[in-house]
Amino acid sequence: MTAAPVAPVAPAAPAAPATPMTPAAAARQAEAFPRLTPAQIARIDPRGRHRTVPAGEVLGEAGEPVTKIFVVVSGRLDLVGPPRWLGEDVPSFSEGMFTGERSILAGGRFLARIQAGTPCEVIEVAREALLDLIRTDPELSDIFLRAFILRRLQLIDQNLGDVLLLGSNHCQGSLHIREFLTRNGHPYKFVDLDTDADSQAMLDQFHVQAGDIPVVICRGTIVLRNPTIQQVADCLGLNPTIDRTAVYDLVIIGAGPAGLGAAVYAASEGLNVVMIEGNAPGGQAGTSSRIENYLGFPLGISGQELAGRAYDQAQKFGAKILIARKVARLDCSTKPYRVQCSAATGEPLLTRAIIIASGVEYRRLAVENLSRFDGAGVYYAATRMEAQLCADEEIAVVGGANSAGQAAMFLAETAKRVHMLIRGDGLASTMSRYLISRIEAHPKVKLHTRTEIVGLEGNGHLEQIAWRTGRSGPVEKQKIRHVFTMTGAEPSTKWLAGCLALDDKGFIKTGAALTTDDLAAAKWPLRRPPHLLETSLPGVLAVGDVRSGSTKRVASAVGEGSIAVATVHQILAE
């Protein structure tokens, strides 16, 4: 990967008049860009400082850390940036309106320049004061959070923002970066060099070649050639600044449902919390197209949307969340415990308690050349992005659990046919009944029992698969270019390096599951036995899918996360 500056793109002209909206769209726009009442502004006033701003003054530059928002008392503020990033109908902020979007919650970076379009009087509200206001004023909290989230959703829906991704639908790296940006809810524009008429002009403009892809252009000035997701996260400023001299109350490892549940409850109860996630919020559940048996969502909710809401909620209460950071090592020899991230520089994080919610990963197909097709025909998530890649084609879904069933039903909406491959004799022991009924009734889904993939073929992209039914059955070849594998569960515990007691499958043992021999081997130092979710190391808990004996469901994981926080309070009081 290399990074190099290029010449900035000229600023956009002031916004063109908006096209007529439907009543529903107008109502949504009013929520995204509300006008505060005098009484509401009066409650904000003591938390900020008044500034008189001349026309043309820049209040925030694209790429700078978002440390404040501005409430307009008089005059007008404009968003200014490259047309390719912002589009044509760019809103301005007039009297009673305020700047900002979802980036302010995480301490990210400005997606565009904020500049005074006319002489203005504004109230400048620092990020910490804003977050305190959100935590203490329910009415203003609803207004700010709804506006920030809706503004971000508009950018995503319109493929606008501060990221341009040049790549190909047949490129593994392109898909991985698209998945990372999509699951983290970061707006971007994707240019498929195989189909876009202006692709050569794009390559020339940024001085890159087709062999460099995927290429990420951050903020119109920084070019990343074939970057890792950690490098993309750093360029976009997705992570807050962490004080590595502080001793935190709690470090949570993993931002799946269990980790997010723990973060929300811990932060809302006043604990100083840092959460570390290797990819994107949601974990394995975040790749589910629709979860229909989660309490309170009768119409269902996608795993990504559920995770995104919890992510915002945890930050609302003050949790600091590190994205694209994997934990390399847990130093369990001294207290406070030390948590070292593989992609981090400097000192490890110091903490009095740890909740491990690192989850599980799908088992990889036992096929020799699998790595050639990862992201080029073999996928581990079923979201709208993957569905677009295989519209009107025959596809295969491997696995018999709920995640595989949800994927099959979702993909059947756009695919020509879905072949569901399972090694067992049926779905009854591994899948919820409501999903089984839908799969059996769907005309485009065909279930193949006692069947497994034994071969993958293709040149650059998957073109054909081979499967076998039964141990001694014949091998059949099928012209299938897309395989979704959602089978088995490998616990993410290799990084623990013997620090904790594990079961024979690598899951973390807790509470009553810990034997006398386990505690003796770990040299358990306390008179009391381990708490319900506590591991063989005092003050270190495990929750969710990574815990031995846990129920592998989203609701169970969230519940364990909240229970663990109650235990953390007891541990901190010892």
Name every feature range the model reports, one short phrase each.
Residues 244-281, 366, 372-374, 380-433, ...:
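Rossmann-like dinucleotide/flavin-binding elements
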Residues 2-57, 94, 103-105, 131, ...:
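Cyclic nucleotide-binding regulatory module and flanking cytosolic helices
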Residues 195-253, 268-269, 286-287, 321-393, ...:
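FAD-binding core/adjacent interface of flavoenzyme oxidoreductases
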Residues 160, 165, 169-197, 206, ...:
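Beta1-alpha1 glycine-rich phosphate/pyrophosphate-binding loop at the start
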Residues 40-43, 109-111, 115, 128-162:
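A small-molecule sensor/coupling module
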